[in-house]
Amino acid sequence: MKNKVALICGGKSEEREVSLLTGRQVRGALIETGFDVTTLDLNDNLVTALKEDRPDVVFIALHGKYGEDGCLQGLLDILGLPYVGSGVLASALAMNKAISKKLFRLEGLLCPKDVLVSRYSLQQPGLEGAIEQIDKNLAYPLVVKPNKQGSTIGL
């Protein structure tokens, strides 16, 4: 009997298209390896689909919000379904670049210089302070990335 794998991809984040591509590639590899694969999208019917399918394991092929941030991992834990990848805490911490870098630095790992700028500090009157902090701590050219997204969408 083949192991049943629920492959979750797509999702609602800005990284949906990347996730769908990942899902197609993972699905092909799993089928080629001999697994029975059901592909599911992250939507309002996900819990019902997982309860009906009762997979042996869930493969999370989501990128960004809800897939890499610990949310889906928490849901799967509640449902009692094993999954591939890190758990809730590790996923949540890793998705947050600022927290991850603080933890890395505490362990003595070298990290590039960075400045965390909130959306509120980009509004007047905080904008000048944010620019001053960037000018003081970083060199141009520089890279701007969202703190809690991956896949470098829009960069």
What does each model-identified segment do?
Residues 13-23:
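Glycine- and acidic-residue-enriched helix-capping/strand-helix junction motifs
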Residues 1, 5-9, 93-155:
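Active-site nucleotide/adenylate-binding loops and adjacent lid/helix of ATP-dependent enzymes
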Residues 40-52:
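Eukaryote-biased intrinsically disordered, low-complexity acidic regions enriched in Ser/Thr/Pro
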Residues 53-54, 138:
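Active-site charged/polar residues at nucleotide-handling catalytic sites that mediate phosphoryl
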Residues 25-35:
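A short, Lys/Arg-enriched amphipathic alpha-helix followed by its capping loop at the start of a domain
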